[in-house]
Amino acid sequence: MLLRMTAWFWKSGLAVISFVLMFSISGCSDTPPEEDTVSETVIDVQDVSEEQENEEEIINICIDLYDKAAEENKLDDLEIIRSIVNRLGENGYPAVDSRNQVNMTEAEQVLEFCKKVDAQEVADITILEVGYLGGFVKYDLHTKDGNVDVVRSYYGYENGEIQKEVTGRYQAEYWNYTEEGYLMFSGVWFSEELYVLTLSGAEEHTALRVQPLDETYRELSRKYLLPISFEQNNMFIVDWSEEDFGDLNFYDMYDILYPKVNGRYVPYVADDNLSVSAVYRIPKEEFESVIMKYFNIDSETLQSKTVYDSEDSTYEYKPRGFEEVEYPEYPYSEVIGYTENSDGTITLAANVVFPYSGNSKVYAHEVVVRPLEDGGVQYVSNRIIPSEDNSEETWHTPRLTAEEWEELYGGE
């Protein structure tokens, strides 16, 4: 995953990015600085020599795989990532990929460490998280009296070498091994490099799947759920079906599906003047060709769920504005079971995993998909499984209603 160091200021419904620093690091989120000075924190962690004692060994274990991947321009290839994870495991290291698409190696070591945390015993472990940007994170964890201290170091591959680029330390403010088989922990880490640039620490939320998952489940997730995901849409948030599309927002779906259909970004963008909301008229054929490729829906039904002008046969389209911005941390759906139905559809049972909130099951839902002969797919329905343990979808900001839009821009 990518570490985004972004200072966000929320004012009058606007999100203004004041500074962006990109690191090839996994599992971190954005946090504004609360003070101009770093508080003096003393953490009982391993000596620097102990932290570095396995560094050279780890690099030597996998450097040839990185060389091969770079030569073939496949540093982000899943099978390459899998080979690196497995090589580390063969040499006794717990390892997993940053997208939790490969079963963790040496998971028993991690489970034993978690038991020692609960028992308030003293223990150490190194866990490696292989990223998709040509590098990996090394977590050196130390526990004592039930507290967990974290030393996280990022190693990047470049020009035939793997080098440590940044190291941070923190004590885990949140630590949990979940019923769904995830190790989730978080805290605010500091490093000299980071402080020079931001005068603050970085908030990190880490989610590592410890328990194995059937590869078929992961393939189904990658094929049907992850391409939609949760950013700026409610497809997996609300109940809907082909018989009743409910509150499914087809404008959000248009934004997500347009690039998949046309191979380029949606050309209908927000106005440069932030006080003005752009309004477009999209020809009927253009709008429907995007939606109907992924949904079995007729024109009449689609028109009833949108704003359609029958006089010129166009769909009104308003791109999301700053009032509809979302904080850039999202969950993902993970298939944990499936049923092949007699009508050719597939029912996917999935959990919503949200690393930012430290929750490996925000809620469970069922998604029905219809695979097509040409390799495509139609989405048939989504149903949230009722439970007292379900959490709210705090990441989502819906599009403005007609009334809200009129109140903001109607007088222009």
Task: State each model region's role.
Residues L14-L21:
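Hydrophobic helical h-region of N-terminal Sec-dependent signal peptides
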Residues E34-E412:
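Mature, Sec-exported extracytoplasmic domains of Gram-positive
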Residues S24-G27:
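C-terminal motif of bacterial Sec signal peptides marking the signal peptidase cleavage site
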Residues L2-L14:
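Bacterial N-terminal signal peptides that target proteins for export
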Residues S29-T31:
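Bacterial signal peptide processing site
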